[in-house]
Amino acid sequence: VLNDLVGIETGFMTTIHAYTGDQPTLDTMHKDLYRGRAAAMSMIPTSTGAAKAIGLVLPELKGKLDGVAIRVPTPNVSVVDLKIIAKRATDVKEINAAMKRASEQQLKGILGYTNAPNVSIDFNHDSHSSTFHEDQTKVQNGTLVRVM
């Protein structure tokens, strides 16, 4: 939706997600010192394949996005904090309107849209692949865009 609306010059995402079953519950030895830390007690920075995966699904974005992940002590639900440099100037109102329209039309049932002050637990059992959070949209100097 963003690429169709304003074009994406480049971008960076931080995926924040629940720890996974292969992480230890207590600090332990591991070749990756981050991965050896207690999953239920720490926010753990790690790598992500999400940026590369987007390039596979949307070839026009291949090589334009990079990112990192942070695993957090929650049982489920993830969030993506995406920042892009838009190819043209925009504002919060335009971004939110496009995302709302997409959630009601071409991405109905796939993309959710909310303006409620929801946190991760509120999305348990939500059937949408992703939910756009209206009050988290920020635009700086017209082209630096941040969405969640």
Outline where the language-model segments fall.
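Alpha-helical support elements that line or immediately flank enzyme active sites
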Residues: V1-V6
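C-terminal substrate-binding/catalytic lobe of Rossmann-fold NAD(P)-dependent oxidoreductases
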Residues: E9-T10, T15-L144
